[in-house]
Structures are given as structure tokens and as C-alpha cells.
A protein has these predicted regions:
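Alpha/beta enzyme core
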Residues: 2-246, 297-307
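Extended, intrinsically disordered, low-complexity segments
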Residues: 7, 249-307
Length: 307
């Protein structure tokens, strides 16, 4: 889509609060809700496109494919979770990141994971009552290997509107790993990364990080517990966290689909779903506009036929 708003420009104006998306409809919902930027979640893409957990199943072709489709129809900047770059060699990472930039990404996260995604394993182990630390689950590659990928991503983004976000996966749960995380973040900044993302989970983490890592920072996925937000956005903005994301639409979509599906299945008719409008809009035209801009394409078709 031409004349898109630039992610870098939005960052210069203030804090951005962005939902994670995974397809054109979730991106459309974000637009209609008023969000000014979108985060393409690697996990949500794996769930929706492949029906698989976030364990490294997604390929660069799949991520490029959905990036291009979302950016073709949505006016807001799309920031892409590019995992470990989908390769070990920095030249492979360079080519992959260049493809994402060409597909329309205005931000790319490049992380230091091994390619074996650890979050799913960590939470699964906890659910089974196993004793496992986040450091054991979220393994990372050697610092210099990751930095070569950061450098390759920066080269792929050079001269474009795409922002490189260096994502440090080293946990902050002990002094040794905290120091390593800060070393990685500082080195990535020295290479030219405009934004840093770390495993911050609370305001205390944010304050510790802000002492060492200056400039733009990304807060990955705010949450809440017992109805209380884990952080206040204004508080973390003061510490340099000007890009904050959250998971919402995969949850909302599954909740809605299960609710409508269960009601219709129970009633053996479509009364429940037909009595509940789409997106809070009353008329059929308004409901259809929540999906796609029908008028634009129908009118354009009519214009082409007017010889």
C-alpha cells in the first residue's frame, strides 16, 4: 500500500501501543480499533497458518507471504517477528531480511535464540509441574554469532523505512545473565540497531535495563494478573520503552468462534450468530465493511467496465 505511515516517524512522536496480528482480518480489526502499528507475531502465525505451536515450524516463505498480504491492504506499519533470521549464516539472514523489507515490513526483530523456540517448552513444563528455569528453556546462541545476524539485518534495512530491533533473549533472572544481556544490547546498539528488545516483565526489570540501555526499547507483550496490568504504559515510556505490544486478537477470535459455534451447535440452527452483529455495527453494509472495503473494489470494477 502506497503512502503508508512510517514506523520511525511514529516512534519519534511518542509511545506506540500495538496488538499482535497474524492475518489480514486481524490487521483489519486493529485498524478499526484505532491502533497505529501492528506486530506480526511469530507464534500467532504458526498457530493460524500451520496449526502448530511456536516451536520453530514457520518458514521464511510463510512469513514473507503473510507480511506482503497484510502490508498490501493495511495502512499502518507492520513490525515482523523474524525469530533467529531463519538461518545460521549471516548472508542467509541478510537475504531473508531483505525479502521481508521488500514485502513491506517497517520493523524487524532479530533474536539470539538457537532456532529451537523455548517459550512453548517452558510453559508446558511448568504446566506438568516440572522444575525448569527459563534459562534452561530459552537457550541462546553465542553473542558474536547473534551480532553477525544483527549486522546482516541492519544491512538489509539500510536506506529503507525498516527499523532493526535487536532482540536479546538472555534472561534477566540472575546477575550473570543480566550482565550478558546488557553486553549484547550495548553491542547491538553500537552496530547501529535503533531499538532493543529484552525479556522485561515488570517495572523493576525496566528500571535496571534503562540504566544500561539508552534510546528506543521494545516491551514485548504486556499482560495482567488478577485484573491488574503488569505495568503502566506511562511508567515504562519514561524509561525509553516507546514500542509496546500485546496478544489479543488470536484470543478474541478463538473466543468468538467457540462462543458462536457452541451456541449454534447446541441450538442446531444459526439464530444465535445471526442475532449478534459483526463488530458492533447494525447494518449489513457496516458489517461487511468490517471485513474488507467492498465498495472500493466493486466501484473500481464498475469503472473498468465503463468503456
Amino acid at each position: 500500500m502506497e503512502n503508508k505511515v512510517k514506523f520511525r516517524d511514529l516512534l519519534s512522536e511518542g509511545q506506540i501501543f500495538a496488538p499482535c496480528v497474524y492475518d489480514c482480518l486481524s490487521a483489519r480489526a486493529a485498524d478499526l480499533c484505532g491502533y497505529k502499528a501492528l506486530m506480526l507475531s511469530g507464534g500467532a502465525v504458526s498457530y493460524s497458518m500451520d496449526g502448530l505451536p511456536d516451536m520453530g515450524f514457520s518458514t521464511i516463505d510463510e512469513v514473507v507471504w503473510i507480511t506482503e498480504r497484510i502490508t498490501n491492504v493495511n495502512p499502518w506499519p507492520l513490525i515482523v517477528d523474524a525469530d533467529d533470521g531463519f538461518g545460521e549464516s549471516p548472508v542467509v539472514v541478510y537475504r531473508n531480511m531483505h525479502r521481508l523489507v521488500k514485502a513491506g515490513a517497517m520493523g524487524i526483530t532479530i533474536d539470539d535464540s538457537t532456532g529451537i523456540r523455548g517459550a512453548e517448552r517452558f510453559f508446558y513444563a511448568l504446566a506438568k509441574g516440572e522444575k525448569i528455569t527459563i534459562s534452561e528453556a530459552m537457550k541462546v546462541v553465542p553473542r558474536d554469532l547473534w551480532l553477525t545476524k544483527v549486522k546482516a539485518t541492519l544491512a538489509a534495512c539500510e536506506g529503507t523505512d525498516c527499523v532493526t530491533i535487536a532482540r536479546v533473549g538472555v534472561p534477566l533472572n540472575n546477575q550473570e545473565s543480566f550482565i550478558e544481556a546488557m553486553e549484547r544490547a550495548v553491542r547491538a546498539k553500537e552496530l547501529g540497531a535503533e531499538m532493543i528488545m529484552l525479556n522485561v516483565h515488570n517495572l523493576e526489570d525496566a528500571r535496571r535495563v534503562a540504566k544500561y540501555v539508552k534510546g528506543w526499547k521494545m516491551w514485548p507483550d504486556v499482560t495482567s494478573k488478577d485484573g491488574v496490568p503488569d505495568v503502566n504504559l506511562d511508567d515504562v515510556y519514561e524509561l525509553g520503552f516507546n514500542f509496546v505490544t500485546m496478544h489479543i486478537f488470536e484470543k478474541a477470535a478463538m473466543y468468538g468462534m467457540m462462543k458462536y459455534g457452541l451456541e449454534n451447535f447446541k441450538n442446531q440452527n444459526a439464530v444465535y450468530s445471526e442475532m449478534h452483529d459483526m463488530g458492533g455495527y447494525a447494518t449489513f453494509k457496516q458489517q461487511m465493511m468490517t471485513l474488507v472495503d467492498h465498495e472500493k473494489w466493486i466501484d473500481l470494477e464498475a469503472d473498468f467496465k465503463n468503456l
